[in-house]
């Protein structure tokens, strides 16, 4: 499992899980078959990258001293990221987007000194009006 996100749905008795795995069709089919054997599983849907909206969220704590603070803020603006906490020598940046966008932002912030970061893992939803029940 590369990432796992879980949240309550509009029905408080049901949770939705997004499980991200890497593998060929055989591996994916095996995972789907094993999950479908679980009594608690209501439905399983494979989300294809091109037909779904996939996002990840990250919080990144970065050293922000002197003139670097303004550059970090500008970099965040380019990525539509938000500064959610400001300390004397650091800021915490919140970014949401594709895996590639998050990784690019982290790479650009590295020269300033990343103190720590955490990512949610992908969550996804198919595009269009069809819903998963």
Located regions from the model:
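Long, contiguous binding/interaction regions
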Residues: 1-16, 20-133
């Amino acid at each position: 499992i590369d990432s796992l996100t879980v949240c309550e749905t509009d029905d408080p008795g049901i949770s939705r899980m997004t499980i991200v795995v890497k593998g060929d069709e055989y591996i994916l089919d095996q995972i789907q078959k094993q999950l479908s054997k679980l009594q608690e599983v209501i439905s399983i849907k494979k989300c294809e990258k091109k037909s779904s909206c996939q996002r990840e969220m990250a919080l990144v704590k970065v050293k922000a001293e002197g003139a670097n603070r303004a550059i970090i803020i500008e970099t965040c603006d380019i990525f539509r990221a938000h500064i959610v906490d400001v300390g004397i020598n650091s800021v915490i940046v919140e970014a949401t987007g594709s895996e590639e966008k998050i990784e690019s932002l982290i790479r650009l912030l590295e020269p300033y000194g990343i103190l720590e970061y955490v990512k949610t893992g992908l969550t996804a939803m198919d595009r269009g009006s069809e819903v998963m029940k």
